[in-house]
Swiss-Prot record:
Name of the protein in its database record: Pyridoxine/pyridoxamine 5'-phosphate oxidase
Gene3D superfamilies in the record: Electron Transport, Fmn-binding Protein, Chain A
PROSITE patterns per record: PYRIDOX_OXIDASE
Keyword Chloroplast assigned: no
Length: 213
């Protein structure tokens, strides 16, 4: 393998310009997400979610974006997970969408709050049966002795709910992220990337700045 310091490539798929940038960051995000889906990217809704605990220790993990509604980015998770526990003590959050094939990325910085239970139940009911059962099976981030033990818990859960509707567990919920900043990055030749930062001024207005790469 060649040295890691020598692994690089040029970015040459295009430019993001003042003329092509949409004035609404949500519309720009929707356009880029549609481009990612159209390009056949695997897991185009996958995003890195960064949180910080009460001791100031950051953590990251990949989570799937499930909606953008009412100006908020939405995802769901076990409320006992590290990310949920972090957010319940420190609501600051960062999302990162890495669309490598398109030489694009989007950064979202803001604050998270819990979704209402009726929204959680509505989404939970739309999930595949196996995903509903898995949510009840897993005490996310807790130790377990083996995969066989996990599968045994899953089978027990299937029996428990074999003849009834499956409600959303109380320990499972969703978060909505209200962004304060949304940054769009397009790779450029000679590492002269295009970066535009939307910063929230109030509930409906954003300032826009081009940033140096």
């Amino acid at each position: 393998m060649q040295p890691l310091s020598q692994i690089r490539r040029e970015y040459s798929q295009g430019h993001l310009t003042e003329a092509s940038l949409l004035a609404d960051p949500y519309a720009q995000f929707d356009k880029w997400m549609a481009d990612a889906v159209e390009a056949g990217l695997p897991d185009p809704t996958a995003m890195t979610v960064a949180t910080v605990n009460s001791q100031g220790q950051p953590s990251q993990r990949i989570v799937l974006l499930k909606d953008v509604m009412d100006g908020c980015f939405v995802f769901y998770t076990n409320l006992g997970s590290r990310k949920a526990q972090d957010l319940l003590t420190n609501s600051k959050i960062s999302l990162h969408f890495p669309w490598h094939i398109l030489e694009r990325q989007v950064l979202v910085r803001g604050s998270a709050s819990l979704l209402p239970r009726q929204d959680v139940q509505h989404y939970f009911s739309s999930r595949p049966l196996s995903s509903q059962l898995a949510a009840w099976t897993s005490k996310q981030s807790q130790p377990i002795e083996s995969r066989d033990a996990l599968l045994s818990r899953f089978e027990d859960t299937k029996i428990k709910f074999s003849d009834k509707d499956i409600p959303a567990p109380e320990f499972w919920g969703g978060f909505k992220i209200i962004p304060q900043e949304i940054e769009f990055w397009q790779g450029g030749e000679h590492r002269l990337h295009d970066r535009f930062l939307f910063s929230r001024e109030n509930s409906s207005n954003w300032s826009i700045q081009r940033l140096m790469p």
